[in-house]
Amino acid sequence: LKDHSDDKPAEFDADFPQKPHIVMVVGVNGVGKTTSIGKLAHLYKKAGKNVMLGAADTFRAAAVDQLKIWSERADVPIIQQGQNADPAAVAYDTVESAKAKDADIALVDTAGRLHNKKSLMNEMAKIKRVMGKVVEGAPHEVLLVLDASTGQNAMQQAKAFTDFVDITGLVLTKLDGTAKGGIVIGISNELDVPVKYIGVGEEIEDLQVFDRELFVNSMFKD
């Protein structure tokens, strides 16, 4: 269980090989995606980085509003457009702005409508393409947010997303309740994608860097 070298880095790594470092965040609605982005922004800001958020989940007015609230809580700027704006346009603006304002990192929230795979696939591809036009190699990370409490369902969602976007890391939320740890390790091993962060509560500080050894040990404690 403990042997998956990629998710060893238990300390928070805020050093990027390039600037701005672009992170695209994916996941279905209701898994805590926007909340996780807010908490990540807070972590990076605390580490002394210039952070920018991009609200490219434009089909859900609540998502943009929610991200705006988190941007205020974390005290970082946000790039947004009106509801139903083209997500790729928002992503483009975010990356362009991050570059112009010398930001260290941009976190871009994207829509998670898995029921319409074709359009979502096209949208993701377009978002990646426009980001890459502004900053070479962007997005440098693609994080998939999953609700650990949904068990097998989380596994299916993870597989569905990996079909059309290269996931580089997992964020597992709602781990503050009963032991749902097995699914965390299961998804990571099955997809061969490291778990980067775990969400253990509602507060801004409640996103932790994943430490596999510590995590597995705590699973087997009485």
Q: For each of these PLM feature ranges, what is it?
A:
Residues 1-56, 63-83, 91-99, 103-108:
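Primarily NTPase-proximal linker/entry elements flanking Walker-type ATP/GTP-binding cores
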